């Protein structure tokens, strides 16, 4: 977990957001670094690995000039809800937003908030039955997060490959 946790902390601190330290304490105390994902990456540390995979994919595929700090925030916090064994998919995004903003006091801009809130929706252009989701109104950040999340869920990386990439990224910056 060492380099993975260091990478997440470094990336979030680089955003220089108010309450980032409170967010990092929440993530540590509530088990973000050891949490499992619900339907993929179902092993200890799965949420951490998945979130890093999502971030790496999103950074590589950012063709719309989305600010890097927004990509970091959305990707690393989109599954914050997995802490303490939470598994209710229907409230997945809203719980992640609530933990970051209300519990930790961390500020999300509008695009980040919407991307995290709706990241589980929009696998088709219709959204989910009975929701007020409309894919055409969402930002490029939401589209990037959705695509990166879907890619990681379907194509998990080997931990050693991630560790090598993180070492390279940490050395560069």
List each language-model region with its residue ranges.
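Metal-dependent phosphohydrolase cores
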Residues: 1-173
């Amino acid at each position: 977990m060492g380099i993975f946790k260091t990478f997440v902390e470094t990336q979030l601190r680089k955003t220089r957001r108010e309450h980032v330290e409170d967010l990092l304490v929440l993530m540590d105390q509530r088990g973000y670094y050891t949490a499992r994902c619900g339907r993929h990456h179902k092993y200890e540390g799965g949420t951490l690995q998945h979130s890093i995979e999502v971030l790496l994919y999103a950074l590589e595929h950012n063709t719309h000039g989305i600010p890097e700090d927004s990509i970091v925030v959305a990707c690393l916090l989109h599954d914050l809800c997995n802490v303490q064994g939470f598994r209710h998919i229907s409230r997945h995004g809203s719980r992640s937003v609530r933990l970051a903003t209300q519990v930790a006091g961390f500020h999300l801009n509008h695009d980040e908030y919407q991307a995290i809130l709706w990241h589980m929706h929009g696998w088709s252009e219709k959204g989910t039955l009975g929701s007020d989701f409309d894919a055409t109104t969402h930002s490029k950040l939401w589209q990037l997060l959705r695509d990166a999340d879907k890619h990681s869920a379907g194509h998990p990386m080997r931990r050693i490959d991630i560790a090598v990439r993180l070492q390279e990224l940490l050395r560069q910056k």
